[in-house]
Amino acid sequence: MLLIAGLGNPGPQYAHNRHNIGFMAADEIFRRHRFSNWQKKFQAEIADGVIDGEKVLLVKPQTFMNLSGQSIGEAMRFYKMTPADLVVIYDELDLVPGKLRIKTGGGSGGHNGIKSIDAHMQSFPGGQNYRRMRLGIGHPGAKELVHNYVLGDFAKADNEWLDTLMGAVADNVAMLARREDNSFMNRIALAMGDGNQRPGGVKTDPAQLEKAPPKAQSHIRQARQNQKKPNIPESGPMAEMLKKLLGKKD
């Protein structure tokens, strides 16, 4: 059995926040696969289904982000699961929008939801060795801007890459059930344009950058560059006259 937990804050006022991208991913998985209706249990909204022959429990903790571990730990104890059975989906400031990374174990990176889960996983065999799916939301640039940034809504310009990312995660979730994490990341990168994507859906190909045309020049400079050098005679009457005219010495 696999438990997929999407992190976020409950309530309509948070629904479109960057911090709620984990909830968004869980909702898209729910929509694209056969799951039971959402029900309230373990201080969460949960739904169960089967993906590629693997029983999957979707969990959206309703405890608010900072207490996510309470809900997830309760569900895992009920189903007698270990951290190896857990995948947590959450927002990552240190990845550009549209990037995705999966890693087993590691630190919290300052994410309060992950801090809470790490604390509750200490009572399980395997501790913090659960899979973490980080979805890039970008960084506002200064530490003091982070709070309002993560609790702010995605801009309309983000919808293109956000919809593509959510769809790719949901469509390829069977790879997570099979523990094919590298193949999953490769598939997402392809869906997002080989991973070379800037915020706002603008794709950048390194090969194209290397072959970029020179900067535009003014028509005067172009004319000067294309102008042929005059053919000045070096000897004869004309050469002598030019020397006198220009004051050129031998």
Swiss-Prot record:
Residues 241-250 have a biased composition (Basic and acidic residues). The active site is at 19 (proton acceptor). TRNA binds at residues 14, 64, 66, 112. It holds the Pfam family Pept_tRNA_hydro. The record marks 91 as: Stabilizes the basic form of H active site to accept a proton. It is an enzyme of class 3 (hydrolase). PROSITE patterns: PEPT_TRNA_HYDROL_1, PEPT_TRNA_HYDROL_2. Residues 192-250 are annotated as: Disordered. It is found in: Cytoplasm. Keywords: Cytoplasm, Hydrolase, RNA-binding, tRNA-binding. The keyword Ribonucleoprotein does not apply. HAMAP family: Pept_tRNA_hydro_bact. Hydrolyzes ribosome-free peptidyl-tRNAs (with 1 or more amino acids incorporated), which drop off the ribosome during protein synthesis, or as a result of ribosome stalling. PANTHER family: PEPTIDYL-TRNA HYDROLASE. Belongs to the PTH family. Monomer. This is Peptidyl-tRNA hydrolase. It comes from Brucella abortus (strain 2308).
